[in-house]
Curated annotation (Swiss-Prot):
One of its GO terms (cellular component) is nucleoplasm. A zinc finger (C2H2-type) spans 274-298, 304-328, 334-356. Sumoylation at Lys-67 represses transcriptional activity and reduces cell cycle progression into the G(1) phase. Has no effect on subcellular location. There is a cross-link at residue 67 (Glycyl lysine isopeptide (Lys-Gly) (interchain with G-Cter in SUMO)). Interacts with corepressor CtBP2. Interacts with PIAS1, PIAS2, and PIAS4; the interaction with each ligase sumoylates KLF8. This is Krueppel-like factor 8. It comes from the Eukaryota. Transcriptional repressor and activator. Binds to CACCC-boxes promoter elements. Also binds the GT-box of cyclin D1 promoter and mediates cell cycle progression at G(1) phase as a downstream target of focal adhesion kinase (FAK).
């Protein structure tokens, strides 16, 4: 307000010669001065001593809600670096301390395995490049690598735990780390011998509980399986596996068929227990009625007599009497389908049909 008064006084001095305009200017400045007191009062309210003298630390809860964020330069540098840890998206978690950029950029070297490292062939192909390289497997300290040597050029590799990652050589730039998960199953490596002949095939055997139960070595030329015990302490040699049973089943088929035929013959012999006891006769029957009819041949007994008037024929078997009785009645139940001729006996019809076949 002091500067405003000085400005008004200077204007009054410059406009002394102009009487009419001076009066108008005073009216304008008077209206401006009349409006100044509310503004002064408003400013006095804004700068009240209660607010100025208030202690800013009386409400510490307001400052606890304020989160201190790292500088934008440090956050910008984090986007250019590869992510080495999983992102935690849960709420109300204490923020982990940020690592310096030098520690994040430092290469991570996996621990070297104690034994001689096995190699895996990994082929990576893109739209304009296809490369293949021998990449050493990286085993964690908890992993167990056991290998068993067998005759020939086979090597069985057992990986108990999983392989977390495979580190690529420095020569192959532009390729990232590939996570590899290997199941706990035996892997079989078979190579051809120097002479180029077919090598033996090693087939792993998995028991019903999912554990390794040994392996079977199969020769492609002879297909004769040979069991090889596994290096696992809990594994046992089981010949009841599916692969071995299928091969053994093929070899045992002729013996099984012969055994079945022998059982059938024994069954027939047991059933044919009715044997003729006359001297010089070795007839055997499965039914006692047939044996009785046969014995009548030796004894001459004829119990079946024809009941037709004036006929005195007798027979040892009932079927013979039936055929004889058809002569009296004239019934011929057996008819030829080709010429419609009828016969009283089935054997006569069979002889007649042979004539049609030979014609």
């Amino acid at each position: 307000m002091v500067d405003m008064d000085k400005l008004i006084n200077n204007l009054e001095v410059q406009l002394n010669s102009e009487g009419g305009s001076m009066q108008v200017f005073k009216q304008v400045t008077a209206s401006v001065r009349n409006r100044d007191p509310p503004e002064i009062e408003y400013r006095s309210n804004m700068t009240s001593p209660t607010l100025l003298d208030a202690n800013p630390m009386e409400n510490p809860a307001l400052f606890n809600d304020i989160k201190i964020e790292p500088p934008e330069e440090l956050l910008a540098s984090d986007f250019s670096l590869p992510q080495v840890e999983p992102v935690d998206l849960s709420f109300h978690k204490p923020k982990a301390p940020l690592q310096p950029a030098s520690m994040l950029q430092a290469p991570i070297r996996p621990p070297k395995p104690q034994s001689s490292p096995q190699t895996l062939v990994v082929s990576t192909s893109t739209s304009d490049m296809s490369t293949s390289a021998n990449i050493p497997t990286v085993l964690t300290p908890g992993s167990v690598l056991t290998s068993s040597q067998s005759t020939g050029s086979q090597q069985i590799l057992h990986v108990i735990h999983t392989i977390p990652s495979v580190s690529l050589p420095n020569k192959m730039g532009g390729l990232k780390t590939i996570p590899v998960v290997v199941q706990s199953l035996p892997m079989v490596y078979t190579t051809l011998p120097a002479d180029g002949g077919p090598a033996a095939i090693t087939v792993p055997l998995i028991g019903g509980d999912g554990k390794n139960a040994g392996s079977v070595k199969v020769d492609p030329t002879s297909m004769s399986p040979l069991e090889i015990p596994s290096d696992s302490e809990e594994s046992t040699i089981e010949s009841g596996s599916s692969a071995l049973q299928s091969l053994q089943g093929l070899q045992q088929e002729p013996a099984a068929m012969a055994q079945m035929q022998g059982e059938e013959s024994l069954d027939l012999k047991r059933r044919r227990i009715h044997q003729c006891d006359f001297a010089g006769c070795s007839k055997v029957y499965t039914k006692s009625s047939h044996l009785k009819a046969h014995r009548r041949i030796h004894t001459g007994e004829k119990p079946y007599k024809c009941t037709w008037d004036g006929c005195s024929w007798k027979f040892a078997r009932s079927d013979e009497l039936t055929r004889h009785f058809r002569k009296h009645t004239g019934i011929k139940p057996f008819r030829c389908t080709d010429c419609n001729r009828s016969f009283s006996r089935s054997d006569h019809l069979s002889l007649h049909r042979r004539r049609h076949d030979t014609m």
